[in-house]
Structure formats: C-alpha cells, structure tokens
Regions:
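Catalytic core of nucleotidyl cyclases, primarily class III adenylyl/guanylyl cyclases
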Residues: 92-124, 138-182
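Cytosolic regulatory/linker segments at or just downstream of nucleotide-handling modules
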Residues: 193-221
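Catalytic NTP-binding/metal-coordinating core of nucleotidyl cyclase/transferase enzymes
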Residues: 50-127
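Alpha-helix/helix-capping structural signal
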Residues: 64, 164-165, 185, 204
Length: 221
C-alpha cells in the first residue's frame, strides 16, 4: 500500500520494500497509517495559511451510556473501554481514508476529503459509519463479558453532514488544528439526536450518497 495521491508513485509503507523510502523519512503517517508522511506536509501549509476552505464530510460518533457506566467502573476499566472504542472507530475511519481529527471524551470526530482527497468522500463517511457499528458490535460483546456489563448499554450514535468548512489552526493561547463551521455543528447535532446503534445523516449527505443509503430517511437539523 502506498501514497499515490501526493507522490504519484506506488510507495510501499510496510515490508522490505519500504526500507529505502524510510531512509528518506517516508513512512506511515500518524494521522492515518494507510498514508505516508508526505501527506502530513499538507498540515504545514494549513498552519501557515491559518485556514483552508474545503468541501468535506464530517462524522461524529459517540459512545452511548458512557457517563453513567463510568461512575460504576474503575479507572482502569474506563480506560480499557475508551481505548477499545477509539481503536474500533480509528480502524473504520482509516479504512475509508478519513482523518481522525479529535477524540472528545466519549466521542470521536472524523473528517473526510482532507488531507486525502476523494470525490466520493461522503460515501466513504457513510461506509465508515457502518463499519464503526459493525466493529463495535463485536468489540462490545467482549467488553461486556470482561467488565460484567450489559452490552446493550454500549451502543454508538453517529451523525454525518457534508459541505464547505474551514480547516486550520484556531485559538490564541492554545492553538488547535481542526475543522470548524456550520457543517461541523450540524454533524454534531445529528449525532446528538441519534439513538444507540443509529446513524443519522442530513439531507445533503443523503443526496450525495443516495446509492449507499437505499431504504434510509434523511432528516433536517
């Protein structure tokens, strides 16, 4: 697997063939191990420009029931629960070329179409959301057994919206590289309205990813 988009070369990121590239500092990115460090250079551009406007899709996923559960669990158990949740979300997001932008308590925020560009970024976000649900269904059974919990208390609610947003470094005393704008706020509201094990998408997401959402219903937020 390589980073075709930036270098237009099939750069191997793993195995013996990756050794020569690693000598030049080209290795799997910390943002997404399926991309290389060349992609990280895009963030340098963003930092210098302060912000970049781009069409993108934002996904929020939240672990339902976490606040109540955390009050009855040991710190180690809470840590294990969050680590497992973050890992399953990250794997699904990276599989569809998304950027895991933030982990916020019991929630994650992902951006699709930055820095890895794709015309199908909205479809990718929808597929990543479904993959998160599938992966978590399996993981939470194991967690429920090991932590003596009711697996039904560990559902995930997901919200998705797409459109123009600003990506850059914001803040004065504490600078934060992230996406902001109406798209982000709307995706967050959709996630808040989603029930456990539910994915809510907006009308614009439905319009762009209709073929992946057959039988689904869009809602206004």
């Amino acid at each position: 697997m390589g980073c075709w988009q930036q270098l237009h070369l099939p750069v191997p990121l793993r195995g013996v063939l990756s050794v020569p590239f690693r000598a030049f500092g080209i290795r799997p990115s910390r943002m997404n191990p399926n991309t290389c460090t060349i992609c990280e250079l895009m963030f340098t551009t963003v930092m210098r420009a302060r912000k970049v406007s781009t069409d993108a899709t934002v996904l929020f996923a939240d672990l339902r029931g976490y606040t109540t559960l955390s009050q009855s669990l040991s710190p180690d158990a809470v840590s294990a629960l969050l680590d497992a949740f973050y890992d399953e979300c990250a794997g699904a997001i990276w599989e569809y070329d998304g950027l895991l932008n933030k982990t916020i308590g019991d929630a994650v925020m992902a951006v699709f179409n930055f820095p890895i560009r794709s015309e199908d970024h909205t479809r990718h976000a929808v597929r990543a959301a479904r993959q998160i649900q599938r992966r978590w269904q399996v993981a939470r059974k194991t967690l429920a057994e090991s932590l003596s919990l009711d697996g039904g208390d560990l559902g995930v609610g997901i919200g998705i919206h797409c459109g123009e947003l600003s990506f850059g470094e914001f803040g004065r005393s504490h600078r934060d590289l992230t996406a902001i704008g109406t798209v982000v706020n709307t995706a967050s509201r959709a996630q808040s309205a989603a029930g456990a094990d539910q994915i809510l998408v907006t009308q614009e997401v439905y319009r762009r990813a209709r073929s992946d959402l057959a039988g689904s219903e869009a809602k206004a937020y």
